[in-house]
Amino acid sequence: MEEEDEEARALLAGGPDEADRGAPAAPGALPALCDPSRLAHRLLVLLLMCFLGFGSYFCYDNPAALQTQVKRDMQVNTTKFMLLYAWYSWPNVVLCFFGGFLIDRVFGIRWGTIIFSCFVCIGQVVFALGGIFNAFWLMEFGRFVFGIGGESLAVAQNTYAVSWFKGKELNLVFGLQLSMARIGSTVNMNLMGWLYSKIEALLGSAGHTTLGITLMIGGITCILSLICALALAYLDQRAERILHKEQGKTGEVIKLTDVKDFSLPLWLIFIICVCYYVAVFPFIGLGKVFFTEKFGFSSQAASAINSVVYVISAPMSPVFGLLVDKTGKNIIWVLCAVAATLVSHMMLAFTMWNPWIAMCLLGLSYSLLACALWPMVAFVVPEHQLGTAYGFMQSIQNLGLAIISIIAGMILDSRGYLFLEVFFIACVSLSLLSVVLLYLVNRAQGGNLNYSARQREEIKFSHTE
């Protein structure tokens, strides 16, 4: 205890205000990197936060990066292959409601993050063992366990961000976290196929053992994320002791009875969300073989094209977030994003144009939609219902992804890629119709969702007077 008190006194003696004014630090004061009230220390924490979710996002799309190898080595059709994505989504139909509750009331942010990181690690290891032992059911079970940790770990990551950066660069932090997530997905898409070929050359043959070893090596990223979770827990506990700050909480209040009070605009936002994302993530999950078969690309080139959505999303998400913040007009931006996605899918389905064009357009529209759609929930729901609204939105998104992943696999097995693309076009068209309906309903109700940034500022100012 005496050492802890000395550390706290040393840090407080050389506080950030003195350092910012250029005053000399008190004797015995620790370096800025060790002081939880200083920017340098917060940047260290930010680095750990970004890598906290890296393993989860890297391994989520392992099946997409190894689609050909998984189907060949495990001798499964596309329908069974897509179950690897469906099993990830099923637990999150329920857990989206309770992830925040578990972090706030049961585990706490530190233990919650460690536990969810362990689920991610164990799930990936079981997934890899399924390949090594040629047991596809074990791979499915591994993806289920992986899913239990994956989405809840993202909630924990956001909770840490708010705890450390609220009022201090928070929007930038969220943008950087999203960018790191997309980098993880991109690295996976371009690395795993190459890694498989190297292990195949080393072992002298392809097969389920080669697949399992490749997935096990990919799981090292999950161990890296677990190490970050442990380091964050230590630093957060240390900061709480030194600065007497409270442990971070999600602030979510989930009341399922609030669902009956949801307005028509909110239900339309839910429909837009589900119909849009089911035409993006399952497509990426199946995209590699599509680019190989239709356009004649090599496996490596097909992986690069398939990952371009994430490549573009990494730098553009913060840019589009700033753009929407500065301009407002959320519905118009959502309309542009959904329309551009529809054009992208139509180009891929009905033309032989270079798919880089369509995929770059899809990457831009995907980034724009996330920045414009999700904040709209806060404009149509009272603050005390936000946790329920976002939980419900994520829940039905995961339900949609689970069901559509299976349907997409069945369509591809029975009808081929053209029919699958027509199916995705139908989903995006339904999303576009919902955006138009949202615009009309919102206009009839006063138009608050489509206010400009200036109008929102004026209304906010008038309410404070």
UniProtKB/Swiss-Prot annotation:
Gene3D superfamilies: MFS general substrate transporter like domains. Residues 1-23 are annotated as: Disordered. This is Lysosomal dipeptide transporter MFSD1. CDD domains: MFS_MFSD1 (cd17340). A motif (Dileucine internalization motif) lies at residues 11-12. Homodimer. Interacts with lysosomal protein GLMP (via lumenal domain); the interaction starts while both proteins are still in the endoplasmic reticulum and is required for stabilization of MFSD1 in lysosomes but has no direct effect on its targeting to lysosomes or transporter activity. Its main location: membrane. PANTHER family: MAJOR FACILITATOR SUPERFAMILY DOMAIN-CONTAINING PROTEIN 1. It is found in: Lysosome membrane. It catalyses: L-alpha-aminoacyl-L-arginine(out) = L-alpha-aminoacyl-L-arginine(in); L-arginyl-L-alpha-amino acid(out) = L-arginyl-L-alpha-amino acid(in); L-arginyl-glycine(out) = L-arginyl-glycine(in); L-alpha-aminoacyl-L-lysine(out) = L-alpha-aminoacyl-L-lysine(in). Belongs to the major facilitator superfamily. InterPro entries: MFS, MFS_dom, MFS_trans_sf, MFSD1. One of its GO terms (cellular component) is lysosome. GO terms for molecular function: dipeptide uniporter activity; protein homodimerization activity. Keywords: Lysosome, Membrane, Transmembrane, Transmembrane helix, Transport. The dileucine internalization motif is required for lysosomal localization. One of its GO terms (biological process) is protein stabilization. The gene is MFSD1.
